[in-house]
């Protein structure tokens, strides 16, 4: 049964468990338990974790909560986990446990308490608490100092002096990553005095890429939302006493007048995707996935494939004057486009199927948009992406416009005797694009898919030929029998030839049956000979074993006689009680 992980990516322990599973290629289903909607308090979830907290896992019959316990279990239960995460060395494991226990009582109260009471509380329906934030900041500062002076002392790259991260590194770094939701200046104020901690965070992030950035993307989006709220509050209530500025300046510092400029620079680095950007990304994906000279089919790794796409997007002439996007950003945007467009394709198919007489194409679009909103409670905003992808096999409509005009019929026309039917998604049934007609583009098969297809075709052809040959022989026999029964006439030249053919066919069948019988008889004879040889071998082995046992018994008897002879040769009083007992016992056995 597949592992189930119940998590909310806004939760630090949840992010640690998700990154660990992804890095170690553990197959799992991620089930969202929204903390904002209080889903962790539902009766259904409390059957899994009575504490009402995330993360929790279900692995077969096992239900487990607490992130540290989950990480230890996954490290021990799954063979794909590399040893450096939770080494077999018991002394190293003990040190990891000491770090994890310290984490719960020091770093976690400091980091979580500060972020909650200075930024996140309003999002959870709670008031901000500057006093609690100041207390948490003191705990956080002391914890960072302890990390740098004790756990990261010397030139250690990771905790405990290892060259690779452990579950302790992952758990603590995910804890500190929640500081990303703070204002940039506030976050740097807390971390910049601790250079070793910053290097350690970056080393752990690189060791878990690209999964670390993917899972922490929710923090980056939250940071953007909080920054917009700060800007709106600053614009509506300017002045040094602004409440929003106070939240980001707990501890005696102030954002100052450079807050807006800093936010503008950060937004320039993380600019939004525009429709032209989406079109370039889609073109890059289609070209990279369909070009037989470039694609390495199923043998290429995912990051190599996306690096090609990222290079294609960065080299686009229309984006020459803009900051380059990373390949993992392109992958995240593509996943969103693919998800939304696939959902809209289903709604568009449903609208085409329901198309009534007299409805125009615009009417169908309106119905599709309404179906999308009814199903997913949001508007479809990627029509430009759908229009780029609609002519490809994966995203094309399953209903043709011609059939839809006739009342939504989905009947297909047989094109040839090979069992091929017309369909809007069948490349063979789509005509060549003439006078602006649209043509569905098909993705080329990969190496393995092509070989499998050729093998299936060859096997199918061979089976069809055998069946056709068998049917032909049966039909010939049936015709001969029917003619003989119906036409009870004197044999002429034609009847003689038919009778000769029938006799020859029956003779051939009898010869085949006789050959099969002889073959089976020969196999039985060989089997009987084999059984006789095995029985003879067993008999010889049994005889040898009996002789061996007899020889062993004779050796034992001779040994006892030698011992008795030695004891009898001694004078009275020279033997001990045990030797006298042994001598009497041997004499009794001999008699």
From Swiss-Prot:
Belongs to the GST superfamily. Theta family. It comes from Arabidopsis thaliana. Residues 229-272 are annotated as: Disordered. Its main location: other. GO terms for molecular function: glutathione transferase activity. GO terms for biological process: toxin catabolic process. Residues 89-226 form the GST C-terminal domain. It is found in: Peroxisome. Glutathione binds at residues 11-12, 40-41, 53-54, 66-67. This is Glutathione S-transferase T2. Its EC number is 2.5.1.18. Keywords: Detoxification, Peroxisome, Transferase.
């Amino acid at each position: 049964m597949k592992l189930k992980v119940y998590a909310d990516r806004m939760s630090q322990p949840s992010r640690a468990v998700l990154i660990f599973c992804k890095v170690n290629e553990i197959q799992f289903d991620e089930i969202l338990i929204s903390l904002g909607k209080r889903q962790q308090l539902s009766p259904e979830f409390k059957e899994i974790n009575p504490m009402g907290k995330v993360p929790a896992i279900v692995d077969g019959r096992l239900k487990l909560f607490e992130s540290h316990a989950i990480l230890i279990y996954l490290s021990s239960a799954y063979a794909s986990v590399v040893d450096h995460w939770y080494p077999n060395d018991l002394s190293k494991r003990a040190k990891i446990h000491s770090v994890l226990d310290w984490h719960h009582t020091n770093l976690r109260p400091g980091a979580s308490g500060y972020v909650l009471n200075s930024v996140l509380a309003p999002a959870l329906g709670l008031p901000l608490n500057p006093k609690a934030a100041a207390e948490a900041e003191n705990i956080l500062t002391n914890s960072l100092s302890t990390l740098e002076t004790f756990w990261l002392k010397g030139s250690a790259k990771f905790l405990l002096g290892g060259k690779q991260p452990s579950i302790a590194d992952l758990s603590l770094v995910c804890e500190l990553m929640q500081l990303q939701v703070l204002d940039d200046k506030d976050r740097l104020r807390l971390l910049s005095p601790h250079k070793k901690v910053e290097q350690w965070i970056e080393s752990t992030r690189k060791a878990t890429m690209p999964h670390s950035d993917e899972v922490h993307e929710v923090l980056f989006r939250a940071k953007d939302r909080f920054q917009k709220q700060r800007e709106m509050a600053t614009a509506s209530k300017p002045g040094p006493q602004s409440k929003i500025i106070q939240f980001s300046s707990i501890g005696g510092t102030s954002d100052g007048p450079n807050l807006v400029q800093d936010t503008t620079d950060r937004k320039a680095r993380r600019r939004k995707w525009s429709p032209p950007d989406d079109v370039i990304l889609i073109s890059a994906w289609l070209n990279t996935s369909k070009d037989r000279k470039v694609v390495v089919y199923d043998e290429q790794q995912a990051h190599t494939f996306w690096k090609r796409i990222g290079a294609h997007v960065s080299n686009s002439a229309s984006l020459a004057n803009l900051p380059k996007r990373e390949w993992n950003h392109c992958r995240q945007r593509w996943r969103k486009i693919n998800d939304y467009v696939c959902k809209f394709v289903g709604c568009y198919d449903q609208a085409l199927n329901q198309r009534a007489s007299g409805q125009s194409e615009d009417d169908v679009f309106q119905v599709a948009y309404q179906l999308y909103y009814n199903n997913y409670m949001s508007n479809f905003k990627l029509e430009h992406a759908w229009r780029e992808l609609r002519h490809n096999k994966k995203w094309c409509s399953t209903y043709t416009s011609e059939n839809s005009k006739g009342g939504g019929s989905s009947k297909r026309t047989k094109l040839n005797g090979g069992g091929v039917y017309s369909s809007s998604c069948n490349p063979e049934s789509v005509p060549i694009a003439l006078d602006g007609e649209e043509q569905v583009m098909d993705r080329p098969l990969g190496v393995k898919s092509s070989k499998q297809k050729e093998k299936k075709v060859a096997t199918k052809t061979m089976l069809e030929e055998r069946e056709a040959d068998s049917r032909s022989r049966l039909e010939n026999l049936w015709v001969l029998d029917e003619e003989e029964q119906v036409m009870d006439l004197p044999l002429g030249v034609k009847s003689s030839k038919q009778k000769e053919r029938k006799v020859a066919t029956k003779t051939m069948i009898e010869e085949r049956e006789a050959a099969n019988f002889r073959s089976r008889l020969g196999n039985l004879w060989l089997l009987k000979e084999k059984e006789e040889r095995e029985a003879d071998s067993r008999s010889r082995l049994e005889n040898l074993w009996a002789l061996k046992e007899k020889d062993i018994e004779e050796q034992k008897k001779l040994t006892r006689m030698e011992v008795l002879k030695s004891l009898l040769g001694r004078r009275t009083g020279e033997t001990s009680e045990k030797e006298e007992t042994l001598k009497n016992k041997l004499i009794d056995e001999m008699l």
